[in-house]
């Protein structure tokens, strides 16, 4: 199964996305480092099935095909927030980086409102 890590600064919505994609109920709060340990859950990536797209015989081994749609199982990993200097051990530091390195791919969740400063604290929008 493909492992995808969710990375980004603290308080950017990683756990909200994780809960929506996996139907989990991990804690969500408006303070830095609500997520202290990685959470894992299963989800599915959905794409057009190869038999429909290329008009060929389909024999999926790592997924399933239903009504022309391919459902590919993935493991999502909700990682603790990243702050400046994590590689030096700041915040949850190396604990975060070790799990991120074990992922097959990373999704960088970004808070476009600019309401989170470099330490992960909520600030006025546009100042973070």
Question: Residue spans of the language-model regions?
Answer:
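Conserved G1/Walker A P-loop phosphate-binding module
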Residues: 1-127
């Amino acid at each position: 199964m493909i492992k995808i890590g969710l990375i980004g600064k603290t308080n950017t919505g990683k756990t909200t996305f994780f809960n929506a994609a996996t139907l989990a109920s991990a804690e969500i709060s408006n303070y830095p480092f609500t997520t202290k340990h990685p959470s894992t859950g299963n989800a599915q990536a959905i794409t057009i099935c190869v038999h429909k797209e290329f008009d060929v015989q389909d024999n999926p081994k790592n997924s399933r095909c239903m009504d022309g749609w391919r459902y590919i199982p993935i493991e999502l990993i909700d990682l603790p927030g990243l702050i400046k200097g994590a590689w030096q051990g700041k915040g949850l530091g190396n604990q975060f980086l070790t799990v991120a390195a074990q992922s097959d791919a990373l999704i960088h969740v970004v808070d476009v409102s600019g309401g989170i400063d470099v330490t992960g604290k909520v600030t006025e929008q546009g100042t973070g």
